[in-house]
């Protein structure tokens, strides 16, 4: 009897898991479109997405997120240039969802010359700490800084790197790491800019969400983000105070991701 109940429980859990995966991936792209013709490098603006899960994206891809634009590009896991379709990140296929990248590009492309295409390069890995980025740690099978460097090379081969979108800090929201966070931001972004070869490269930082079950520490991380931006004239912080979570008190929902993308774009435009 107990064995039967145990087997039925396993079958039920497997069915539930399959249903959750099916719902999460319903509107994922059915095919990947690679670029059939090359674009002049000087006509491609490249933005690199970096950080942890709220940059990698945990929102649900919905029908409105499936509309692509041939001027908005990304890469696949083999480093090939493709037409950008959500989800853009591919490092954690069992977790990946809607991020802010396509929303960012769609907002930006309305405000720049028609001759310009946008290439969004994903490098964010959920759960990664800034210390792991600085130490080039292997996290979830990704060597964080080395992977960033390899994507910078792809970016340089195909366009002009115009900025970095950064959202990270949840993994650093603890008593040990909070006092070091601002200093680590300075160190990491200096390394990012050195890799790109532009000491004035714009870096756009997103606040942590206001829906955490650990609000005190999240607020302290946000304070360090704002303090950093005061010291770096080539950075901007986007507010997320009004954005909602997906029900887990940790990750932005789909609407929040789209809004965040728009705010990143407007922050970038405000610098030019």
Give the positions of each predicted feature.
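Short secondary-structure subsegments characteristic of cysteine-rich extracellular domains
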Residues: 9-10, 181
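C-terminal motif of bacterial Sec signal peptides marking the signal peptidase cleavage site
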Residues: 14-15
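Cell-envelope and extracellular/periplasmic
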Residues: 19-272
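Initiator methionine at the very start of the polypeptide chain
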Residues: 1-2, 112
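Sec-dependent signal peptide recognition
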Residues: 2-8
